[in-house]
Amino acid sequence: MKAQPKASHFIGGAFVEDKAGKPLPVIYPATGEEIASLYSATPGIIEAAYAAALKAQGEWAALKPVERGRILRRTAEILREKNRKLSKLETLDTGKALQETLVADAASAADALEFFGGIISGFNGEFVELGGSFAYTRREALGICVGIGAWNYPIQIAAWKSAPALAMGNAFIFKPSENTPLSALALAEAYKEAGLPDGLFNVVQGYGDVGAALVNHRLTAKVSLTGSVPTGRRIMAQAGEQLKHVTMELGGKSPLIVFDDADLESAIGGAMLGNFYSTGQVCSNGTRVFVHKNIRERFIERLVERTRKIRIGDPFDEATQMGPLISAAQRDKVLSYIKKGKAEGATLACGGGVPKLQGFDKGFFIEPTVFADVTDTMTIAREEIFGPVMSVLEFSDEDEVIARANDSEFGLAAGVFTADLSRGHHVIGQIKAGTCWINAYNLTSVEVPFGGYKQSGIGRENGIAALAHYSQIKTVYVEMGKVDSPY
């Protein structure tokens, strides 16, 4: 099974190769086999990307917003036309079940392109009357923006970052995760087919040193990262030295609160979506599931029943509901957290091991795992695991669970399940998290902002807010009379 692209990088509207770069093997997580071989960007590749972006950006920014938007919307159409092909590529790249990639990856990328392509013509400055004279503001492009992606949603992240940047008139250079470098190249081809001028969307591959080179480049106006908190801190420090704009979408250890009046099956479904989708590799996952003591036993019993029915196996079988983790290293990390959970006294309700799957013995699979009797101080309740491991904690009253939910360095997301919408709104109003749900979980519509509080990030993806983060404001004062000067 192979997925070798035409070349490692996409610069100035064309595939580009430089075999002097460090080899970058692409591994299919379900089997452990190498499906492609790429090369990390050399300094020459990086400079070529900036030269192409610089050449194209000014003319692009001068276009009418509606003209820029038209190209983005055409790109969305192309992604939808090729959704099945792109979904298969994403499954090869990530190991995620095709059942999932068909609806959640290229499809979400298309949604973002369609949204920003449509709304950009209405994203304007403001007019301020000043008693005869007046002022107005202009929203202007930043210049060349850099995106650094994660390996859980490669094409979605590439589009979520590039769509608002391009809509605002910026040029974009994207570095995918070294684990999942393929689908960003497919997005670049879609942009090209849609008529995006050469040089506006460039893809450079590489490891952390390439990301650092992009962050520190003198022509970089903004950096948008999806990644871990430690990586975010390093990039913030580097960008801060040159006062570059940043958006940081980082990790989480989000609370999901289930009150005793909640619809039990819906709450369990939400908890499973918030822990097992993408094999648990979702930054906003609600991995701390707080369940009211009155329904705790019923909740866990039914949760375990449903979790044991999750179908694990061949990601290309559309009946498969869960694929492997991204790598052997990630699987070993998750298994180490499961070991810690048991050692610290949590009850392993189900899962916790490596399934035996015929034909996939070298894949990076792990069973969906549920821990009960978890306390707030346990490692599995404090640290982001990034795998299919759910911690169920018991609570007895509203004020208590709000305080415990907020007792975290993270603040990316939160959810509440209750039949009392008044209580739902009240609780969410007290939770320190940037993206919240009531009677749902992990639904991320591109029309609304996505991002976190505290250590979970700075800035927002999606919604009109994202356009603000890819632009700068110019204020213009217009004097309608004579200048009144004491000199």
UniProtKB/Swiss-Prot annotation:
The keyword Chaperone does not apply. It catalyses: betaine aldehyde + NAD(+) + H2O = glycine betaine + NADH + 2 H(+). K(+) 2 binds at L243, K454, G457. Binds 2 potassium ions per subunit. It comes from the Bacteria. K(+) 1 binds at I27, D93. This is Betaine aldehyde dehydrogenase. It comes from Brucella melitensis biotype 2 (strain ATCC 23457). The lineage of its organism: Bacteria, Pseudomonadati, Pseudomonadota, Alphaproteobacteria, Hyphomicrobiales. The gene is betB.
